[in-house]
Amino acid sequence: MVNIFDYLKDVAHDSFYDLPLNELDILTLTETTYLSFDNLVSTVPQRLLDLAPQVPREPNMLTSKNRLQILDELAQHKRFKNCKLSHFINDIDPELQKQFAAMTYRLTLDTYLIVFRGTDDSIIGWKEDFHLTYMKEIPAQKHALRYLKNFFAHHPKQKVILAGHSKGGNLAIYAASQIEQSL
């Protein structure tokens, strides 16, 4: 059976100029965003190649063997190793009952990918998931919109793709639907 690791081997020598960004690329970066980039990725863009060895390797619910393997492969492949990562945030606020995490990837000179993380392993994260069923707007959605507005404040008129897994997908859709059309 073909899997994401087979895909990564197939495109290892293709740049994003050779083969445009596609859903499988986004899937790999969405999975990577679940890893702990706390205190590693700031507002200063850094290459994935340089960051990969610094990511904590202690296994837990979010830091799985497969996610670490994806990260290690991305760091070796022409397609991903020079991607610049920035603006990682992991904000868990018990008072607001908010669990929010996101990161920006610069894939080419004019293409950015913002990935919103889905639910993590915190009680707050799961509680916020349940709030999605009956609240008009949850705190993480507000934060996702702020994150996107901040991106455009620093990168006006840039091409950006929004993505996320599970709740992260909801955050991407929410931010895209609420942002001013002029941006």
Which residues does each PLM region occupy?
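Non-catalytic, mobile gating and regulatory segments of ester bond hydrolases
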Residues: 1-163, 170, 174-183
